[in-house]
Amino acid sequence: KDSKEILRRLALSKELYDYHAPIENELANIYDIERLTRRIKLNRLHPFELNYLYDSLLSIKEVVTFMENYKFITPPCSSTDLTLFIQSIDSTFDLSISGKYMLKDVEVNMISEGINTQIDELNTQNDILYSKLELLRNHILSYVKSDDVNYVGINRLDKEGFFLTLTKNRFNLIKQEIMTSHLIVDDELYLFKDFTIKIQTNSVKIFCKLTEDISDKYVHNLRKIIELNKLVFKEKIAEFEKKFAILLEELVQFIAEVDLTVSNIKTAKKYNYSCPKIVKTKENENFIELIDLRHPIIEANEEQGIYVPNDIILGELSLASKEYKDNVIIKNSNPINMNNNKMHGVLLYGINSS
């Protein structure tokens, strides 16, 4: 019934017909933002979904910029508004980390520096602890006689905590010399002969009182960091909801219209479709005339033979085109009362075959 809306959409497809290529790839990179918007409203968004939102906003920004330049559709916001949203996400979270986790599975810090002072303090403490392990690594490297930090690794396992590791061959080369060595960390003397050395098939693990103490403190801080990360993530998503919820809802409608228009254009080009003509009828009249009607999905899946299109004429038959006035369906549908010349339905036998 809403002919104006249909005509508007058809006109938009005609306008974009030769210009949709630049935004087609961007549309393919946009996630289901309607679903993401619902999850933001419920504050049930996961960190990895935040990455989906971020990537989607980058592509949406390109679509909005395109529309700002060429005026096909008026976007609900400016590219500057989207830049603000994008920067809000980028400055708050480390997206290289958040993209790996559901909220319950977060195991490292993903909050950017300057967002939460408690997290920053705990991260600073852990950086100091880790630097002590690097002193130990540098001590071993001095005997390996190499500046390549990859020769000696610093690893951590849940059960064993922190330990240093190097190949069995390298350790055997320095074993005699390094076992008589020592180092001082925070005014405390550590004798290498007191270290625990675990020799494995191809590598050696090195533990000591220093690595044990650091492991305990580091893990204790990390647990606090993870819990604070979950709280801050929830708080920030709630802030985004208050600030950008309306914008997201408007973008959902905007992208849906652009996506539908591009889909119409691609289908029309592929199957050589043409626009329908809307016939003006009275309030109590309905009419539809479909000649050589084709179904894009069925036609695309046709594997054998030739797709057979259909002709359908329904409603007020007096409105039928002149060339179809002699159509057998129209002739046989005429009732005794010529004032009520309507076709209310078609009974189809069989299926579309070739």
Tell me what each language-model feature is.
Residues K1-S353:
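Alpha-helical coupling/stalk and coiled-coil linker elements that connect catalytic or binding modules
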